[in-house]
Design a protein with these regions (language model features):
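Short beta-edge strand/loop motif at the mouth of beta-sheet-based domains
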Residues: 37-39
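FMN-binding flavodoxin-like domain, especially the glycine-rich phosphate-binding loop
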Residues: 2-4, 10-15, 22-34, 43-52, ...
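Iron-sulfur cluster-binding cysteine motifs and their immediate structural context
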Residues: 188-189, 194, 198-218, 222, ...
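A mid-sequence, solvent-exposed acidic-amphipathic segment
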Residues: 162-201
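Short secondary-structure transition/capping segments
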Residues: 41-42, 117-120, 213-214, 253-254
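Short low-complexity, flexible loop/linker segments enriched in glycine and/or proline
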Residues: 121-122, 223-225, 254-258
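Long, positively charged, glycine-interspersed low-complexity recognition regions
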Residues: 236-268
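Amphipathic alpha-helical segments
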Residues: 20-21, 227
């Protein structure tokens, strides 16, 4: 039995997890967002995988919290897939969140279409098609390695040592203390909002609630920074103040619906 845990705001990681599960017949997909804040998480599977995005060069905080509280079968085969290139320090961080003596046997990172619109523009249709083709090749290779329970731990390029061990921690800390908190207070819905409630449905942190037919971001609930609300809004009404998002495109994986994203929060 293989359990694949995933976290996905705009569908990239869910799509990759689905493709991987197709190639691993014994695989079961389990959403990380399903688990409550204080819920104990126990797995008895012989193999466990994670398919997750990268936020601010590192793990999304819900994924980190999941690993801190999860209890996997001792000696089980563990693998991780990130849907964005990252430093190998991300995977060593994941190792440290496991019980002493445990580590991820195989780790993989590759690019899916970018979704962090405060910095990047969304990919063109041609770019998305290219990335999709490359993703399928990556998943074929990953499935082969996982099926064999092989060890696969790539190393950073030697020239990246300073970036990964000195610059990365500083940038990550800045995002945590400054960039994300400021952005969290900057979400709003413009006059294009129809009050459909999609944003609240896909919000993986349950931060968004509908009040008087308009979305409201609860200040006492921590944002997951998944941008599902932004990318799935059918009227493109969700904006981020000061981030020039009125001119940015929207993207979610075409095979993943808003209902699929919202379903991650559904309890088993």
């Amino acid at each position: 039995m293989i359990e694949i845990y995933y976290f996905s705001g705009t569908g990239n990681s869910l799509h990759v997890a689905r493709q991987l599960a197709k190639r691993l017949p014994e695989a079961e997909l389990i959403p990380i967002a399903r688990f409550g804040r204080r819920e104990a998480i126990t797995s008895t599977a012989d193999a466990v995988g994670l398919v997750v995005p990268i936020h601010a060069l590192g793990l999304p905080w819900p994924v980190k919290r999941f690993l801190e509280r999860a209890s996997f079968k001792p000696g089980s085969y563990k693998f991780a897939v990130t849907t964005r290139e990252c430093f190998q320090t991300v995977f060593t961080t994941m190792d440290k969140l496991l019980p002493r003596g445990e580590r991820f046997h195989a780790c993989f990172a590759f690019e899916m279409p970018v979704t962090y619109v405060p910095v990047f523009e969304v990919y063109s249709e041609d770019e998305r098609a290219r990335v999709e083709r490359e993703m399928l090749d990556h998943v074929d290779r990953i499935a082969t390695i996982v099926s064999r329970r092989a060890v696969h731990r790539p190393k950073d390029h030697p020239g990246w040592f300073v970036l990964s061990h000195m610059i990365y921690p500083l940038v990550r800390r800045w995002f945590q203390l400054v960039r994300f908190p400021n952005m969290e207070r900057s979400f709003y819905a413009n006059d294009s909002c129809t009050g459909c409630g999609t944003c609240a449905q896909v919000c993986l942190a349950n931060k968004i609630v509908m009040r008087g037919g308009r979305p409201a971001w609860q200040p006492n609930v921590r944002c997951a920074y998944c941008l599902a609300c932004f990318h799935y809004c059918p009227s493109h009404a969700i904006q981020i103040s000061g981030r020039n998002t009125t001119r940015r495109g929207r993207y979610h994986h075409p095979s993943v619906s808003a209902a699929d994203i919202a379903a991650q929060k559904r309890r088993a």
